[in-house]
């Protein structure tokens, strides 16, 4: 029984299927997942091979897994992560190991499209069936024999070439020696020259080297002599600089002492007393400023009152003139009588002469129009007055807001704080000067270092890094030379000629060393004369050895050689496009290092300068507060002026309001008069309703001519009366206001006289304040000068110490210079002696040349004899090697032929069994006679005309249907016939493999057949494969000998 669990596999999210060892039909429409069940079994057993479709993971999911359980075996294969787990009786195997066990138990995957595959694929599949596990071993044997034959051929060609080459070389060596013997005369041993002044037991070259060293040392001393002179000059400059600096410091000390003498009076006074005195003066100034502002306000009020008296006097004169210009009929005494008489006359007229009284209506109408005009004028005047009042009120509110926002006491406090801030500003300025002096001192040190840099090194700063890089390269060269010399002793015996290798910095020398060690790596002896090869991956030397008729591959690595090759490659990468690494003296290297140290010191000084500049920047930014003090004093003055303006605006507002009330009363009187006239009209005309102009006009047409003169008199009288009364009331109010103003003026003048000396008091206080403030500043300066004096004294001490040090250095340098002068004389003597040695060395070299010629002659003679004997031994070895290789080649050829013969026998026997099984199934599936045979044939693989032909076994299909031979691709068969032939091959392969564990899976194999034929086929399958799981997939339910039918829709 097989249990199949699917998770996110194709169209199945989470499904489990159970199959017994019986024939099962899986039926469902297209797209239901029938084939996915068979794919899942194949995926679990053999994975996603070439025949399986990819994309096993369900759409929208990240991974999938298939678990197949058979008896005590559980196989689980997952994708993302790709993992295979094989479990049997609590033993777990994974991935490749698990696949090996699956293939052993369930066999290899069957070929479903055997007929459609090429002849080469068919052959490969049949070979796997025929040989099973031993297929890989046979292929490995074939490959080994081929490789062995190839290597033997290559080696035989190499040895033949070497043999012919050595014979030619031997011949050429003998000919060369004979030609030389004809032309060269045998040289004689030369006489040894003698040097008279030579030191005992020391060679002339050693003596020369010793003298050269002495000369070099003396030259160095001369160089040191010049360096000491330059140092002495620099020290003299330093001394002059220090003297100047000491003089400057002394001058500064004198200046500060003079300043202290000038400010000596303030030594007893403390800063707190001065500050307290300034605060008291500020308080008194505050009180006096308040009084001063009050006086200014009173003065402005006095001026306003005086202006007002002038305006009142002008108005009074104008009113008096108007009063005099009125009609002479109106007199003060007879005023009331005149009016009563006029009114009594009118009353008698109203009673006795009604018609004559009605004529007055015209006058009243004109009066009404005039009243209406007056009303409109009064209205416009009231509107303009109201607007003016609103404007003035806004201005008053604005000025009041200004006065509210400005706090005079706070301003005075700010003024005192500003004085304190100005003191703080002076302290910070002093601190800033100290920091700037420090920066200047560090800059001096930095300039000294830059001078040293100019003296110690001639190159630029930009070139130092390049030179430093060159120094590093030189150190690498030295380390490489040390390593090369150390391994020479180890490799002397194995590799002769390693002693001659030298490296002085040239790239060509490195390439020579590389070539030597690479040749050594691949041509070293491995115990016997086995051929050498290179590994294609790691390039290690390999050898094929024959022991006891077995072929072994041997690897050999010399660690020293590999390590030096790595170091050579590293050094070659350092060269880039250069050919040599420039050699430098130790003194130059030391100069470069010293120069680099100086650069680092200069950078350290630059960092210190940056820190000090940041400290200067971080100091609180304060400014001189004198301008702010002046601006605050100006604001206090503007505040006082603002108060004066406010008083003016308030008086103006009062006047405007007064005029407005007058205008309102006037308009009320005019309105009352108009109402009176209207009432009279109602009574006179006799109309209860409102009087209209039409009624009046009709009335006027009758009585207009009679009442014209009387109307005029009445109008003049009444208007004059009103004007007169108004003028009288105005004169009265003006006189009252004048009395009030005179009293106010008297009080203001009295106040001003009492405080007449306030300006003098303020000036005195300001002078006293300025004096205290200057004393306070001077006190701060006094303290600064004290601290400055101490700093200058310390500087003077430091400069004196450095001056003493410089003088001691000068004395030591002078002593050294005296010693170096003696060395110059010694140098001249040694140079004369050196000339004598060089003349003798020339004679010595001539002797050495003649001796070398004699030695070379003897060496050549010995080498000739040795090379002839060597070539003869090499020729004998190569001939023996050729015989051995021929024997090995014949043995390999016989082995290859036997392997191919065994393969052919196994394949032909398998093909015969396949033909038998296939023919059995075809006889059951077809009514007509049909014969199908798999036949073996050998295809010739011949490349080129001269190449030897290679015969490769291949398989083809021969089909005789209805007595006719069909083509090899079976294209003449119908789809149903082709399906039956293909099914016969599938069943035959399954029966030959004889694996009852692996289920037989048939996917739509009878889709092109009718019901009866398909029933027949399935009954045949069931008979031939009893007690075995058979899975059949079909679109719809078909009849047949099925033990179980699964419909996926019902199952889902």
From Swiss-Prot:
InterPro entries: P-loop_NTPase, RecF/RecN/SMC_N. Pfam families: SMC_N (PF02463). Belongs to the IIV-6 050L family. This is Uncharacterized protein 050L.
């Amino acid at each position: 029984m097989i249990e199949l669990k699917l998770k996110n596999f194709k169209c199945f999210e989470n499904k489990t299927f159970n199959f017994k060892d019986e024939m099962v039909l899986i039926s469902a429409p297209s797209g239901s997942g029938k084939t996915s069940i068979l794919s899942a079994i194949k995926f679990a057993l053999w994975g996603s091979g070439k025949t399986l479709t990819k994309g096993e993971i369900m759409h929208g999911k990240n991974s999938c897994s298939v678990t197949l359980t058979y008896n005590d075996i559980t196989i689980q294969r997952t994708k993302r992560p790709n993992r295979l787990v094989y479990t049997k009786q609590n033993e777990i195997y994974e991935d490749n190991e698990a696949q090996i066990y699956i293939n052993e138990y369930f066999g290899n995957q069957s070929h479903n499209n055997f007929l459609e595959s090429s002849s080469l694929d068919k052959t490969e599949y049949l070979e796997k069936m025929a040989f099973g596990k031993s297929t890989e071993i046979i292929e490995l044997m074939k490959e080994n024999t081929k490789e062995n034959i190839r290597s033997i051929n290559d080696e035989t060609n190499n040895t033949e070439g070497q043999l012919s080459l050595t014979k030619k070389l031997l011949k050429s060596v003998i000919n060369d020696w004979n030609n030389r013997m004809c032309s060269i005369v045998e040289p004689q041993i030369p006489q040894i020259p003698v040097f008279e002044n030579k030191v005992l037991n020391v060679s002339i070259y050693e003596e020369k080297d010793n003298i050269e060293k002495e000369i070099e040392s003396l030259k160095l001393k001369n160089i040191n002599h010049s360096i000491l002179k330059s140092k002495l000059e620099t020290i003299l400059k330093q001394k002059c600089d220090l003297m100047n600096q000491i003089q400057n410091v002394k001058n500064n000390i004198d200046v500060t002492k003079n300043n202290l003498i000038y400010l000596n009076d303030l030594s007893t006074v403390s800063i707190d007393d001065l500050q307290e005195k300034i605060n008291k003066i500020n308080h008194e100034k505050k009180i006096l400023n308040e009084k001063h502002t009050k006086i200014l306000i009173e003065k402005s009020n006095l001026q306003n009152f005086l202006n007002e008296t002038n305006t009142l006097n002008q108005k009074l004169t104008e009113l008096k003139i108007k009063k005099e210009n009125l009609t002479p009929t109106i007199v003060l005494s007879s005023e009331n009588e005149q009016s009563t008489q006029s009114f009594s006359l009118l009353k008698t007229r109203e009673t006795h002469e009604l018609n004559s009284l009605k004529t007055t209506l015209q006058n009243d109408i004109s009066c009404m129009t005039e009243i209406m005009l007056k009303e409109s004028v009064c209205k416009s005047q009231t509107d303009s007055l109201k607007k003016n009042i609103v404007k003035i009120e806004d201005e008053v509110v604005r000025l009041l807001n200004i006065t509210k926002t400005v706090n005079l006491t706070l301003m005075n406090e700010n003024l005192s704080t500003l004085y304190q801030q100005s003191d703080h500003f002076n302290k910070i300025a002093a601190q800033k000067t100290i920091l700037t002096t420090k920066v200047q001192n560090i800059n001096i040190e930095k300039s000294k270092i830059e001078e040293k840099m100019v003296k110690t090194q001639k190159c630029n700063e930009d070139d130092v890094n390049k030179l430093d890089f060159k120094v590093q390269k030189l150190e690498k060269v030295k380390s490489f030379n040390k390593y090369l010399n150390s391994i020479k002793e180890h490799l002397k015996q194995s590799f002769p000629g390693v002693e001659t290798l030298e490296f002085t910095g040239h790239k060509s020398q490195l390439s020579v060393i590389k070539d030597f060690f690479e040749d050594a790596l691949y041509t070293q002896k491995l115990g016997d004369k086995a051929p050498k090869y290179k590994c294609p991956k790691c390039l290690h030397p390999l050898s094929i050895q024959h022991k006891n008729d077995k072929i072994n591959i041997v690897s050999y690595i010399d660690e020293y050689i590999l390590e030096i090759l790595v170091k050579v490659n590293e050094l070659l990468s350092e060269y880039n496009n250069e050919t040599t690494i420039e050699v430098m003296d130790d003194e130059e290297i030391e100069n470069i290092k010293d120069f680099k140290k100086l650069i680092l010191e200069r950078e350290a000084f630059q960092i210190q300068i940056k820190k000090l500049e940041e400290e200067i920047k971080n100091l609180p930014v304060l400014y001189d507060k004198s301008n702010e003090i002046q601006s605050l004093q100006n604001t206090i003055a503007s505040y006082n002026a603002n108060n004066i303006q406010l008083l003016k605006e308030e008086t103006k507002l009062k006047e405007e309001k007064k005029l407005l009330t007058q205008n309102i009363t006037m308009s009320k009187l005019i309105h009352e008069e108009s109402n009176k006239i209207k009432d009279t009209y109602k009574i006179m005309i006799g109309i209860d309703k409102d009087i209209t102009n039409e009624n009046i006009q009709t009335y006027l047409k009758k009585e207009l001519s009679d009442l014209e003169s009387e109307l005029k008199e009445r109008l003049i009288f009444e208007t004059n009366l009103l004007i007169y009364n108004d003028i009288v009331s105005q004169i009265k109010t003006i006189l009252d206001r004048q009395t009030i103003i005179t009293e106010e003026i008297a009080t203001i003048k009295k106040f001003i006289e009492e405080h007449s000396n306030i300006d003098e008091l303020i000036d005195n206080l300001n002078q006293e304040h300025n004096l205290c403030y200057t004393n306070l500043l001077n006190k701060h300066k006094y303290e600064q000068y004290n601290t400055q004096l101490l700093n200058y004294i310390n500087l003077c001490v430091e400069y004196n110490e450095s001056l003493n040090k410089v003088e001691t250095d000068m004395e030591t340098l002078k002593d050294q210079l005296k010693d170096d002068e003696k060395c110059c004389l010694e140098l001249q003597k040694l140079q004369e002696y050196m000339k004598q040695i060089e003349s003798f060395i020339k004679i010595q070299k001539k002797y050495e040349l003649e001796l070398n010629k004699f030695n070379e002659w003897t060496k050549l003679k010995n080498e000739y004899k040795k090379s002839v004997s060597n070539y003869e031994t090499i020729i004998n070895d190569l001939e023996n090697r050729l015989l051995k290789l021929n024997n090995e080649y014949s043995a390999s050829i016989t082995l290859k032929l036997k392997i191919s013969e065994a393969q052919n026998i196994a394949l032909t026997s398998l093909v015969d069994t396949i033909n038998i099984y296939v023919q059995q199934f075809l006889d059951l599936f077809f009514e007509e006679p049909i014969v199908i045979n798999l036949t073996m044939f050998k295809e010739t693989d011949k490349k080129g005309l001269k190449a030897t032909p290679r015969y490769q076994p291949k398989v083809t299909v021969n089909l005789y249907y209805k007595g006719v031979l069909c083509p090899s691709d079976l294209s003449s068969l119908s789809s149903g016939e082709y399906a039956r032939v293909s099914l016969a091959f599938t069943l035959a392969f399954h029966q030959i493999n004889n694996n009852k564990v692996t289920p037989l899976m048939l996917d739509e194999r009878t889709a092109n057949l009718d019901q009866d034929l398909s029933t027949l086929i399935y009954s045949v399958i069931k008979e031939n494969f009893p007690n075995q799981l058979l899975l059949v997939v079909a679109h719809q339910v078909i009849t047949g000998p099925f033990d179980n039918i699964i419909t996926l829709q019902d199952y889902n």
